[in-house]
């Protein structure tokens, strides 16, 4: 069914998830077949009962994992502006227009996907941390967001084809990278023409302990650093950078747009189209 285009195969460690494909013309056939199955079908009822048990188990495991990381999570959040204030400013930057397809790189708990759920046609979150993916998946399932999914993926080598998304977001993720320009180039690769990349991260700071205690590779970024990365990735910079001053960390929102695919095609990873197989 994967080869026929009815299902997508999403490897995650030793496990493999499957979902109905929504990326080609055969996906409508899959949805039509599903619609023909009566809700009272005995096998379907048993399957749904088992699915609910699996979801409950996932939610419990996700909550257990989050309890383990909650202290460090809250310690970081206490250093900058409240989360809701940051969400509001992000929505302001995105604007009121319809988004289309969204890619959240380093999705964590899936919060960005959730707050934009009613504005997108389809949402994908990628993360390397299986524990965080479990939290995000549980949150998305509990919210009933069937047009959103998460999968394991590396920000340096996204499991996506070229020019497949309209908006990519790196929300408080880039400071974990030892090579930010490559992350931004990879994000540019998957953007469609006129697609946008939004980076939310810390302004340059001197809180050195964040390296050792929280594994931050970079102590924030200057405007020039991000702008240079955007330009190197073939993106057109939006000069309207947003700033939310916190104590001691200030959060900034930079954004840029892809005017054409020419700049990224030369940097495209030739293996990209094989990653979903």
Regions found by a protein language model. Give the residues of each.
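Short, Lys/Arg-rich nucleic-acid/phosphate-binding segment
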Residues: 11-17
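A short glycine-rich, Lys/Arg-flanked "PGG" loop and its adjoining helix->strand segment in the class I
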Residues: 181-196
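Amphipathic alpha-helical dimerization/coiled-coil segments
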Residues: 25-72
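C-terminal alpha-helical "lid/dimerization" subdomain adjacent to the S-adenosyl-L-methionine
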Residues: 196-255
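Conserved alpha-helix/loop element of class I SAM-dependent methyltransferases that forms part
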Residues: 81-100
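A short SAM/SAH-binding and catalytic strip from SAM-dependent methyltransferases
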Residues: 166-179
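Class I SAM-dependent methyltransferase SAM/SAH-binding core
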Residues: 101-105, 109-157
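A short acidic, Gly/Pro-enriched loop at the edge of an enzyme's catalytic core
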Residues: 156-167
């Amino acid at each position: 069914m994967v080869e026929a285009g009815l299902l997508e195969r999403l490897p995650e460690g030793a496990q493999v998830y499957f979902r109905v494909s929504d990326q080609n013309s055969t996906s409508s056939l899959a949805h039509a077949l599903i619609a023909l199955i009566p809700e009272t079908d005995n096998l379907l009822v048993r399957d749904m009962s088992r699915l609910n048990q699996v979801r409950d188990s996932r939610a419990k495991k996700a909550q257990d994992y989050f309890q383990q990381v909650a202290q460090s999570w809250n310690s970081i959040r206490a250093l900058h502006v409240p989360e809701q204030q940051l969400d509001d400013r992000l929505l302001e930057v995105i604007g009121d227009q319809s988004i289309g397809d969204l890619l959240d790189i380093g999705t964590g708990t899936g919060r960005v996907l959730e707050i934009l759920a009613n504005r997108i046609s389809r949402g994908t979150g990628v993360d390397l941390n299986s524990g965080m993916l479990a939290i995000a998946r549980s949150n998305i399932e509990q919210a009933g967001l069937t047009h959103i999914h998460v999968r394991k993926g590396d920000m340096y080598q996204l499991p996506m084809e070229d020019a497949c998304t309209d908006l990519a977001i790196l929300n408080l993720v880039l400071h974990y990278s030892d090579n930010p320009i490559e992350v931004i180039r990879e994000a540019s690769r998957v953007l469609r023409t006129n697609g946008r990349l939004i980076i939310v991260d810390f302004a340059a700071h001197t809180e050195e302990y964040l390296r050792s205690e929280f594994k931050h590779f970079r102590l924030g970024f200057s405007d020039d650093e991000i702008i240079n990365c955007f330009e190197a990735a073939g993106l057109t910079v939006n000069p309207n950078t947003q700033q939310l001053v916190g104590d001691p960390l200030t959060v900034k929102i930079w954004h840029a747009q892809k005017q054409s695919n020419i700049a990224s095609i030369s940097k495209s990873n030739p293996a990209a189209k094989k990653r979903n197989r």
